[in-house]
């Protein structure tokens, strides 16, 4: 997977998550699952695991993910990919280690903001449009209510045990990017260096 595809699929889908409109009232059972998901994410200050990313063209990439709230994440892609995605709390950097190139974006412009926030909220600036019960978990479909471009993100959870399994982003062109998490576990004492921006600072793209 090339840098341009990853940048578009993993990060720049954020504008495609925007949809102006009022939040929908959820059924009590659906609201209970949303509350359960929020409580789980709020109680997960740091974690690590592996991920499998499938882009809109069907290309599959794998790697290791580290997350530390608020705002920090690192996606290390397995070889032969030379990609590295790092959020330092404010800025997300998409780097190609082989080409020594990097593009930077504000975290607030990316889907990562939904579960890296200091306070996890799915009722402020986000509209939960659907809660879908699965055999062993549930899915929450959400849209950013501050904007005009159609799109959505689907967060998938297991409920026994409660765990974030991944997310799927659908953009305005109906193209889907899926990130599946494998063996995500709580982590303590993560090296702060994991979340340092790669390569010299460059102007952040807005």
Task: Tell me what each language-model feature is.
Residues 62-114, 177, 183:
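An acidic-aromatic
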Residues 99-146:
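Flexible, surface-exposed loop/linker segments and immediately adjacent secondary-structure boundaries
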Residues 123-125, 133-206:
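Gly/Pro-enriched, hydrophobic low-complexity segments
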Residues 39-56:
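A short, Trp-centered hydrophobic/proline-enriched beta-strand micro-motif
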Residues 55-57, 98-100, 173:
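Solvent-exposed strand-loop boundary residues in beta-sheet-rich modules
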Residues 20-22:
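N-terminal signal peptide c-region/cleavage motif recognized by signal peptidases
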Residues 6-11:
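N-terminal export leaders
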Residues 26-33:
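Cleaved targeting-peptide boundary
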């Amino acid at each position: 997977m090339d840098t341009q595809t990853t940048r578009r699929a993993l990060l720049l889908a954020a504008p495609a998550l925007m949809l102006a409109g009022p939040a929908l009232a959820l059924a009590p059972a659906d609201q209970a699952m949303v509350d359960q998901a929020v409580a789980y994410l709020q109680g997960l200050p740091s974690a690590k695991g592996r991920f499998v990313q499938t882009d809109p063209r069907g290309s599959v990439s794998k790697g290791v993910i580290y997350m530390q709230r608020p705002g920090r994440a690192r996606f290390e892609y397995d070889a032969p990919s030379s990609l590295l995605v790092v959020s330092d709390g404010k800025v997300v950097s998409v780097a190609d280690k082989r080409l020594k190139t990097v593009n930077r974006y504000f975290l607030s412009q990316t889907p990562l903001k939904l579960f890296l926030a200091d306070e996890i909220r799915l009722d402020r600036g986000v509209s939960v449009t659907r809660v879908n019960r699965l055999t062993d978990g549930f899915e929450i479909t959400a849209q950013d209510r501050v904007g005009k471009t159609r799109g959505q993100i689907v967060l998938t959870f297991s409920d026994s045990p409660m765990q974030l399994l991944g997310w799927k982003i659908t953009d305005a062109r109906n193209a889907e990017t899926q990130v599946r998490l494998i063996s995500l576990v709580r982590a303590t004492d993560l090296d702060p260096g994991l979340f340092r921006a790669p390569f010299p600072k460059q102007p952040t793209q807005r």
